[in-house]
Regions:
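N-terminal transmembrane-helix/juxtamembrane module of multi-pass inner/ER membrane proteins
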Residues: 3-6, 10-65, 85, 89-160
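Aromatic-anchored segments of alpha-helical transmembrane domains
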Residues: 39-47, 98-101, 187-195, 267-276
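Interfacial segments of alpha-helical transmembrane regions
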Residues: 88-95, 161-197, 263
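Transmembrane alpha-helix/helix-exit interface in multi-pass inner-membrane proteins
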Residues: 103-119, 186-212
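Membrane-interface loop-to-helix entry segments
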Residues: 145-160, 232-251, 286
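Membrane-interfacial alpha-helical segments at the cytosolic side of multi-pass membrane proteins
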Residues: 162-169, 242-260, 290-301
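Membrane-interfacial catalytic/cofactor-binding modules of polytopic membrane enzymes
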Residues: 192-257
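Interfacial helix-loop-helix junctions of multi-pass membrane proteins
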Residues: 201, 236, 269-295
Length: 317
């Protein structure tokens, strides 16, 4: 495919975005439907299964606060004239809500399936590989390699908004909406996966299997801080890290091609880092990549359906 054809394909997809459903003066786009729908879904889930969740009242209050914050951002965003402020308000609100929903999703993992499914993952990987990959990889651990893997794992937090800025300031608001919608939907699909097939993760399920410590420098310290202070048990399959990294990489390919090539070694290393560093099993990472690919493929059709619904609503009104 020629560069012109690739650009045209990206423009066609970006052109799907921008339709707004106005509710009480607030314009909702496709990404907003995903975020607000997820907030409502988790609130309903917590109400129904509150007996199986620790401190459900606190989670409901947090969801209410997040909802007010997000709706407030939707109210103020169109009134901003400065492009930088518009970017930070829009992107910051979506990405903050995704991060907060991840923390809430971790608390709801065992409400349907009541036990961790790590033994099933271990059995599958033993049958496929003959070894447990996360344990087998210990023979390759060195401080420099650990530091690089930790860099790839944590720099994702910078790429997340950074790529959004590149897309926005080079291509405009509609391509940014494509990026944000796909990120939001991928996150939510991963969160649902946590409940359908809850997996504790190798670090929590079998810590005794790891006899070689993960030593490195600054990024290793940063990564371990995230593991011990932000991550909780679970949140494993599909791997949100691999899923979101795939979305970022493919969106770079669609809108900012030089960034796609520049990110290649980082994203490929990130995939490996998730199980090399014992955050995930190899299976989690593969499922995360496949989840992102599926979401990317179906997103244009979903946005088209959103647009049709908005137009029907406008006609009926």
């Amino acid at each position: 495919m020629s560069r012109r054809s690739r650009d045209a394909a990206g423009d066609r997809i970006a052109g799907l975005y921008g339709e707004r459903l106005f509710v009480l003066g607030v314009g909702l786009q496709a990404a907003d439907a995903v975020i607000l729908g997820a907030l409502f879904f988790f609130a309903l889930l917590i109400l129904v299964f509150q007996g199986r969740i620790t401190a459900p009242g606190g989670l409901l209050l947090r969801l209410a606060g997040l909802s007010l914050f997000y709706i407030g951002s939707l109210y103020f965003h169109p009134r901003l004239k400065n492009r930088v402020l518009r970017f930070f308000v829009r992107t910051g609100a979506v990405q903050l809500l995704c991060a907060q929903l991840f923390l809430i999703a971790q608390r709801t993992q065992l409400i349907v399936v009541r036990s961790w499914q790590d033994p099933a993952v271990l059995k599958l990987e033993a049958a496929v590989f003959g070894v447990q990959p996360t344990v087998w990889l210990q023979k390759f651990i060195t401080p420099p390699l650990t530091e690089w893997m930790m860099f790839a794992y944590v720099i994702y937090l910078i790429i997340y908004p950074g790529l959004g800025a590149l897309i926005y300031f080079r291509k405009g608001e509609r391509p940014l909406e494509d990026y944000l919608f796909t990120l939001a939907l991928t996150n939510v699909v991963c969160f649902l996966g946590f409940m359908v097939f809850p997996v504790a993760g190798p670090f929590y399920h079998m810590p005794e299997a790891y006899t070689v410590p993960l030593k490195g420098g600054f990024f290793a310290v940063w990564g371990e801080y995230i593991r011990r202070n932000i991550h909780e048990i679970g949140g494993t399959i599909p791997s949100p890290h691999c899923a979101i990294a795939t979305v970022m990489w493919m969106m770079a390919h669609r809108y900012v091609r030089p960034a796609f090539y520049a990110l290649a070694p980082v994203i490929l290393s990130l995939y490996v880092s998730t199980f090399f560093l014992r955050y995930h099993y190899l299976t989690d990472s593969v499922v995360g990549v496949l989840t992102a690919i599926l979401v990317i493929l179906v997103s244009p059709a979903l946005v088209g359906a959103w647009n049709s619904a908005v137009r029907r609503k406008g006609t009926s009104a």
